[in-house]
């Protein structure tokens, strides 16, 4: 199986000179020259390049006294119902009823709809996130939204499952 890092960048297309979509490997991307707060730009690029502090990345690392945690056990610190990855954190996680993620998403949705009234709100979470990240009209509100969501996640300790949950028991040969 290949690496799951940077999957938000794989297969992306840019508008070519002729106006049609084409794959461009080397190009100054629109989100790198934003007139935006540097912390928002860093949050935006951390999602694209998988350098954020969500469990899907942090728990892949070996740390002192802890082996890497298998991906399926890198659960969300709020709901523990799904892997805490970019799509779950930014689009899917509901947390609990008093959680700030839902109002943040609603505010971002209103802002995006004001900028791009005919924006297509995909039912597929990954498609929606890809559209939000790569739309050239939306990087400022999306970068702020990503920054705010990552701040919410960093304010709560990460869920680290006990190793016995995902480590097979040693079989003793008699």
Residue locations for each model-derived region?
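Family-specific functional microsites
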Residues: 5-174
């Amino acid at each position: 199986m290949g690496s799951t890092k940077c999957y938000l960048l794989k297969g992306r297309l840019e508008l070519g000179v002729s106006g049609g979509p084409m794959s461009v490997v080397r190009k100054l991307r629109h989100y790198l020259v934003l007139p935006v707060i540097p912390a928002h730009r860093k949050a935006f690029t951390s999602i694209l390049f998988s350098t954020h502090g969500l469990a899907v990345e942090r728990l892949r690392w070996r740390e002192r006294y802890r082996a890497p945690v298998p991906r399926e056990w890198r659960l969300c610190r709020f709901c523990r119902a799904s892997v805490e990855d970019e799509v779950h954190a930014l689009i899917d996680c509901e947390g609990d009823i008093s959680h700030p993620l839902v109002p943040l998403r609603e505010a971002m949705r209103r802002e995006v709809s004001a900028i791009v009234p005919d924006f297509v709100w995909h039912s597929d979470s990954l498609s929606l996130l890809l559209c939000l990240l790569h739309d050239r009209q939306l990087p400022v509100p999306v970068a702020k939204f990503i920054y705010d969501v990552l701040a919410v996640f960093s304010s709560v300790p990460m869920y680290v499952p006990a190793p016995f949950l995902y480590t097979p028991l040693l079989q003793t040969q008699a």
